[in-house]
Design a protein with these regions (language model features):
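Hydrophobic/aromatic-rich, well-ordered segments within soluble, folded domains that form packed cores
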Residues: 1-3, 291-292
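Cysteine-cluster motifs in flexible loop/terminal segments that predominantly coordinate metals
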Residues: 283-292
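Internal, well-ordered alpha/beta segment that forms a basic, Gly-enriched binding/recognition surface
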Residues: 2-120
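Hydrophobic, aromatic-lined core segments that form the binding pocket/scaffold
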Residues: 70-283
Length: 293
């Protein structure tokens, strides 16, 4: 029988009412990704599949306004999942804001392929240690030498490069999680506010320069904000930051997702709004649900 352990069973073996302790095979330590990440991976595979074209027809049968509302409903579900995950991390025993931020940032800088080894390093080497003692890129890299996935990794995304990038950030901004907390944006008064009304360009500049010391840029910066910073800030404050997350700038995403949004006529050079994180996330959620049994 496969079942998730209760909170008490995580420390003590399962025991039946008769007192018998059945043999237990613990698989959780062997899970290299979260179930959500497995689902994302399968959805991304489906984006290149033969069945993707058929999905376009289903969407094009709807009027444009309904297509948009359907996609945003999917994006909202994805946001709620990220928010729930952020809450769990912040509410975990002994969790602190600086350490959760430290772990999340390192995981996201590891990209999908090297998220787990980066998470392992973040847990073994707390932010306070890295800030006080610095860090040696080669020593950190060797700690997870057997775990790195290097096939088809671009030089700028190599784990050594991302470790060096994060160490530079901590050297320049050892208090970066506190600075992030100070950046907490105000919730939108209306869910349909656009980037200008939400002052996202000012927030982006503050996060890039004051919080991250200009050490993380490009689409990985936007992914760090959308997947890490905004859910954590919302979980910490209790404010609804969905509009900020929904209108945030596109981060790293499979090119097939943009193709999907173009095919269902939700983004175009002369369209009503630019491509955004929320539209991409809604598209990804569509394929996750489509591939789920």
């Amino acid at each position: 029988v496969l079942f998730p352990p209760t909170r008490s069973e995580r420390k003590t073996p399962a025991t039946l009412s008769t007192g018998f302790r059945p043999p237990t095979l613990v698989l959780l330590p062997l899970l290299r990704e979260s179930l959500e990440e497995y689902a994302e991976r399968e959805a991304i595979k489906a984006l290149s599949g033969a069945g993707t074209r058929e999905a376009f027809a289903d969407w094009l049968d709807c009027p444009p306004s309904l297509r948009r509302s359907k996609l945003l409903a999917l994006a909202r579900r994805r946001w709620e999942r990220k928010l729930q995950a952020a809450r769990r991390r912040l509410e975990a025993p002994a969790a602190t804001w600086p350490e959760v931020c430290h772990q999340v940032a390192m995981e996201i800088l590891g990209y999908r392929r090297n998220r787990v080894p980066m998470a392992n390093l973040a847990q073994r080497h707390p932010l306070a240690e890295v800030a006080d003692e610095g860090g040696d890129v080669e020593a950190l890299y060797e700690e997870e030498a057997a775990s790195w996935k290097l096939g088809a990794v671009r030089p700028q995304n190599h784990p050594r490069a991302r470790l060096a990038q994060y160490l530079r950030l901590v050297e320049k901004r050892p208090d970066w999680p506190a600075r992030l907390a100070a950046s907490e944006p105000f919730p939108a008064e209306k869910e349909n506010q656009l980037r200008k009304a939400l002052k996202l360009s000012e927030l982006k500049r503050f996060l890039a320069e004051d919080v991250l010391a200009s050490q993380v840029g490009g689409t990985r910066f936007d992914t760090l904000v959308a997947d890490g910073f905004l859910p954590l800030l919302a979980a910490r404050s209790g404010k609804d930051l969905f509009s900020h997350w929904r209108h945030w700038y596109p981060g790293d995403a499979p090119p097939q997702l943009k193709t999907f949004l173009k095919e269902i006529e939700l983004i175009a050079p002369d369209g009503p709004e630019p491509c955004s994180n929320g539209l991409l996330q809604g598209g990804l959620q569509h394929f996750i649900e489509r591939e789920s049994p």
